[in-house]
Amino acid sequence: MTNAATTVSVNAVGKRFRNRVALDGVDLDIGRGVTGLLGPNGAGKTTLLKIVATTLAPDAGAVRVLGWDPAHKGERRQIRRALGYLPQETGAYSDFTAFDFVDYVAILKEITDRQRRRDDVRRVLTAVGLENRMHSKIRSLSGGMRRRVVLAQAMLGSPRLLILDEPTAGLDPVERLRFRETVSAVASTETVVLSTHLTEDVAAVCTDVVVLDRGHNRFTGPPDDLAAMADGHVWETEMSDPTATLSWLTGQGRYRNLGTPPDGAELVPPSLEDGYMLLTAPDSREVRS
């Protein structure tokens, strides 16, 4: 049994697909609140979430979810009853209404009492802002609304652990804001783990962040601590300089640089994105030295 404050415990977990190492000795503990898995494509985020959600078994290491061991069939079933899962690739039957689709998933989740099940379907659809569209056909909904329908099914039964894989992918700014508000409300009482490659998602809702890069856990801690890793390494200047290790346009006609400061550059406070980019840069060890 893990510590009562720990919802998910991952110890030396490894996973390989043919000749590609997806996870290499990953260790981390996740507690209540919102934990963001941040990393580039191919970092191992989806693989790790599938292992925690019990849809994929690790090749090495051990996992505990809510105190249960998913390696044992009986405990794996307990985990699945206690979690909600929004995979990266999702779909919903377009000829179903939003209500009927979520109700169908509730039946699959063995919520057998009809009145309790239908009350819960209404609750989760209202929670994601679809109270006025719950009887609309899914094919008539916008992409953002469809994503919210699938989020609603993950929230059925008030799960103790909610796993969201790239939940804001493809959403417009308004839908992304609404999604973040919903996640924050859920996380006030339960544990949410979400994967993303967008630092703004982490900055907006996450209490902790885990940076995965090429199958390795590069950082675990509060977002402010990740930003602080770039302290003293972030500069802004009016023009780009080839001596800068990384640079990008800030949108105000100025370039932001990580690494060697060009002439006339101004040292500025680091952001979460600065810390993340510095940590995952191919030559990050040289930059931080």
Segments the model singles out, each with a brief description of its role:
Residues L156-R160:
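A short, proline-enriched helix->beta-strand linker immediately N-terminal to the Walker B motif
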Residues V8, A22-G25, R80:
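Conserved structural motif at the start of ABC-family nucleotide-binding domains
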Residues G61-H72, Q78-I79:
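Conserved ABC transporter NBD signature motif
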Residues D95, K137-G144:
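Conserved ABC ATPase signature
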Residues D103, I107-E110, Q115-R133:
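Conserved ABC ATPase "signature" region
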Residues L162-E166, L171:
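Catalytic Walker B motif of ABC-type/P-loop ATPase nucleotide-binding domains
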